[in-house]
């Protein structure tokens, strides 16, 4: 699996240390193991997880501005866990409302010795925003409109929303409230992945 990951990273133009690669593989192995009992993801093959979960998450890293992030509706830690491994200087709060997912995240935190994550079981609407976050990240969580509506209290004055999407979500962008503006839409290149991937970066026009 290390050879496959190394090859994928090379194709993506991403450089990681051996320690980071080993952490990513350990995470995939844990996800594969726990998935049998906890049904954390529909992806069953660890090699497929490398593409659809690991690469699909870490290609976003260069576009994240700031040091404090919250991954809302993180599920089994996607994209938060892979991002925390490739951005060790940043801190990631991993938020999910389901206890079994948060238990898995805490086990990952323990086994991988990840000191820059905080798994939290909570609904996003009820989660406090102090101190505010530099970035609110979501992957397959909600429409853009619902994301900014439910998470409006989380980013700071210079904070941004980062929504990982498949096809270009033009309809969702058109429905955004006027107090939010799309700062950029990045077409992501994920090696060996079928289908399109886009990152939508949204800024609140906070006065």
Curated annotation (Swiss-Prot):
Pfam families xref list: GidB
EC class name: transferase
Organism: Escherichia coli O17:K52:H18 (strain UMN026 / ExPEC)
Compartment annotation: Cytoplasm
Keyword Mitochondrion found: no
Stated role: Specifically methylates the N7 position of guanine in position 527 of 16S rRNA.
Protein name: Ribosomal RNA small subunit methyltransferase G
UniProt keyword Methyltransferase, yes or no: yes
Species lineage: Bacteria, Pseudomonadati, Pseudomonadota, Gammaproteobacteria, Enterobacterales
Chain positions recorded as S-adenosyl-L-methionine binding sites: 73, 78, 124-125, 139
Gene3D superfamilies recorded: Vaccinia Virus protein VP39 (3.40.50.150)
HAMAP family hit by this protein: 16SrRNA_methyltr_G (MF_00074)
Reactions it catalyzes: guanosine(527) in 16S rRNA + S-adenosyl-L-methionine = N(7)-methylguanosine(527) in 16S rRNA + S-adenosyl-L-homocysteine
Cysteines engaged in disulfide bonds, as pairs: none
Similarity comment: Belongs to the methyltransferase superfamily. RNA methyltransferase RsmG family.
Taxonomic superkingdom: Bacteria
GO molecular function annotations of the record: rRNA (guanine-N7-)-methyltransferase activity
EC number: 2.1.1.170
Assigned GO CC terms: cytosol
Keywords: Cytoplasm, Methyltransferase, rRNA processing, S-adenosyl-L-methionine, Transferase
First-listed, main subcellular location of the protein, grouped into a coarse class: cytoplasm
Entry-linked InterPro entries: rRNA_ssu_MeTfrase_G, SAM-dependent_MTases_sf
